[in-house]
């Protein structure tokens, strides 16, 4: 995987992620591992500043382990390994998973038969911000 430090490559391999198809999604950002989030059409989401929506896996490991763009809400992660048409086919089971690395590892282990979609955290039940990062209290339903 180009543009990745050895420690980041090792981290991904330990978790079952080895595909060269993912080289544009994962990159080393200083000491941290950057993970670019893509829409189902393969184009990157944008954060509140207009930059690509990138979640960083912080190294060394601490709390938090991941850092999302400030003021940009949450985004689902759609893997470039997802077969075309999976989101439209209601006969394919949808599996929600916490985190992009696990999604990519699942597609490498089980390439067909399931539609894996990643969430940035299991506590994220409703994103209260719009695409520009603005919050409207009138639309906040506080799902539990």
Q: What residue spans do the PLM features occupy?
A:
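Phosphate-handling DNA/RNA-contact segment within nucleic-acid enzymes
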Residues: 30-144
